[in-house]
Amino acid sequence: MRTLWIMAVLLVGVEGSLVQFETLIMKIAGRSGVWYYGSYGCYCGSGGQGRPQDASDRCCFVHDCCYGKVTDCDPKADVYTYSEENGVVVCGGDDPCKKQICECDRVAATCFRDNKDTYDNKYWFFPAKNCQEESEPC
């Protein structure tokens, strides 16, 4: 029951690009981003500090860094366009900022797919107190 409540809290207020990010993770990695990465390691979910715990957590670290480089639009809210060509997601549209958000999400979803074998349940709901080391630069 606690897990269902946490999942509901994670979904409250989610709009725009975050919904699209979830869709891309499902499409590319074949699993739910909210479920598997909504609260994982030191970087997956809200916030982020310390050292990434494994390759899956590093995907989130790189995604956070990518979002940090986006200017002139809101990576968590703005809606972008993409298409699928021969099974490959291609970011599109005329707005370079929104295209950059899409690329951040596409790269992260691909990273999750490529690192499924490193996913370790011990990092699910990982305590923030274990993420106190100095963060590495992006």
UniProtKB/Swiss-Prot annotation:
Keywords: Calcium, Disulfide bond, Hemostasis impairing toxin, Hydrolase, Lipid degradation, Lipid metabolism, Metal-binding, Platelet aggregation inhibiting toxin, Secreted, Signal, Toxin
Name of the top EC class for this enzyme: hydrolase
UniProt catalytic activity: a 1,2-diacyl-sn-glycero-3-phosphocholine + H2O = a 1-acyl-sn-glycero-3-phosphocholine + a fatty acid + H(+)
Disulfide partners: C42-C131, C44-C60, C59-C111, C65-C138, C66-C104, C73-C97, C91-C102
CDD domains attached to this UniProt entry: PLA2c
Any one biological process term the GO annotation gives: negative regulation of T cell proliferation
GO cellular component entries: extracellular region
InterPro entries given in the database record: PLipase_A2, PLipase_A2_Asp_AS, PLipase_A2_dom, PLipase_A2_dom_sf, PLipase_A2_His_AS
Cofactor binding remark: Binds 1 Ca(2+) ion.
Annotated tissue distribution: Expressed by the venom gland.
Signal sequence interval, chain numbering: 1-16
Cofactor: Ca(2+)
Annotated positions binding Ca(2+): Y43, G45, G47, D64
Record's subcellular location: Secreted
EC number(s) given by UniProt: 3.1.1.4
UniProt KW Nucleus keyword: no
Function description: Snake venom phospholipase A2 that shows a potent inhibition of human platelet aggregation. This inhibition is concentration-dependent when aggregation is induced by collagen, and concentration-independent when aggregation is induced by arachidonic acid. In human umbilical-cord vein endothelial cells, this toxin stimulates endothelial cells to release prostaglandin I(2), suggesting an increase of its potential anti-platelet activity in vivo. PLA2 catalyzes the calcium-dependent hydrolysis of the 2-acyl groups in 3-sn-phosphoglycerides.
Note: Negative results: does not inhibit platelet aggregation when aggregation is induced by ADP, and does not induce aggregation of washed platelets. Does not induce changes on the principal platelet receptors (ITGA2, ITGA2B, GPIBA, SELP). In human umbilical-cord vein endothelial cells, does not induce detachment, does not interfere on nitric oxide release, and is neither apoptotic nor proliferative.
Family the entry assigns: Belongs to the phospholipase A2 family. Group II subfamily. D49 sub-subfamily.
Protein name per the record: Acidic phospholipase A2 BE-I-PLA2
Source taxonomy: Eukaryota, Metazoa, Chordata, Craniata, Vertebrata
